[in-house]
């Protein structure tokens, strides 16, 4: 998973992610928006999941985050449509709206995101 953090013209932190993980970047840009308290909450929930079978989710305005003890899924809330209903052009959009990654990789992203915000 390749990614970078930048500032836009207004000074807002923007996260850009490689193909297959774009939804993680969209989630950071749309739902987190530099909220360090939210990052801390997510990190605490992830720590509580270790070694358990439990899952945790955080539903936002545009994206929902799901965590379990090993994996993370970020999914656009508008993906409630059945995939059979999507034409080929929409399947590409669908792929940009769903990302899966390992929990440890995701937590590393959050750590680097926090560091970028605090340093700039």
Curated annotation (Swiss-Prot):
This is UPF0231 protein NT01EI_0766. It comes from Edwardsiella ictaluri (strain 93-146). Belongs to the UPF0231 family. Pfam families: UPF0231.
């Amino acid at each position: 998973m390749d990614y970078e953090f930048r500032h836009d013209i207004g000074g807002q932190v923007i996260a850009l992610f490689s193909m297959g993980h774009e939804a993680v970047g969209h989630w950071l840009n749309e739902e987190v928006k530099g909220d360090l308290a939210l990052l801390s909450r997510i990190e605490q929930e992830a720590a509580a999941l270790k070694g358990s079978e439990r899952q945790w989710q955080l539903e936002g305005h545009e994206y929902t985050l799901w965590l379990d003890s090993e994996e993370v899924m970020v999914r656009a809330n508008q993906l409630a449509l059945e995939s059979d209903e999507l034409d080929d052009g929409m399947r590409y959009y669908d792929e940009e709206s769903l990302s899966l990654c390992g929990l440890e990789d995701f937590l590393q992203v959050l750590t680097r995101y926090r560091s970028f915000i605090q340093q700039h």
